[in-house]
Amino acid sequence: MTTFSQKPADVVKKWILIDAEGLVVGRLATVIANHLRGKHKPTFTPHVDDGDNVIVINADKVVFTGKKFTDKVYYWHTGHPGGIKERTARQLLEGRFPERVVEKAVERMVPRGPLGRRQMKNLRVYAGAEHPHVAQQPEVLDVAKLNSKNKKVA
């Protein structure tokens, strides 16, 4: 029996809607990354972009476990000498672009390279409950029901 290899022309992409309210960031990012890559499909091929389009709403209402909300630090460098910058998860979630917490978590779970960058373009993250993709008729994926640990309980 020969190994099945998906052809790019045969790829069928669905639209998936995920409500991130109350979900744990890392567990949510894992589910999103698997859907972006297409690993949930039996036709998964590592070198083909056969993942789905994922829409995430309420990204500003995600939660961290333990003390990560106050202690987790995101670093970046400006490119200038002494230009290391840092912000905590709390500062990011309370800042102008709280959706970046989810974007960065997913970005770091997707392969780094041309295919990973193309797959990340299939991710749309919104801080509020509204999204402009109603015409695509996304099907709702309840991440909290997949595993009880996905949703933080008080």
UniProtKB/Swiss-Prot annotation:
Family membership: Belongs to the universal ribosomal protein uL13 family.
Function in brief: This protein is one of the early assembly proteins of the 50S ribosomal subunit, although it is not seen to bind rRNA by itself. It is important during the early stages of 50S assembly.
> What is the name of the gene encoding this protein?
rplM
The scientific name of the source species is Mesorhizobium japonicum (strain LMG 29417 / CECT 9101 / MAFF 303099)
Sorted alphabetically, the Gene Ontology BP terms of this entry are: negative regulation of translation; translation
Keywords from UniProt, A to Z, are: Ribonucleoprotein, Ribosomal protein
Subunit info here reads: Part of the 50S ribosomal subunit.
State the name under which the record lists this protein: Large ribosomal subunit protein uL13
Pfam families named among the record's database cross-references:
Ribosomal_L13 (PF00572)
Q: Which Gene3D superfamilies match?
A: Ribosomal protein L13
UniProt GO molecular function: mRNA binding; structural constituent of ribosome
Q: Could you state one GO cellular component term attached to this entry? A: cytosolic large ribosomal subunit
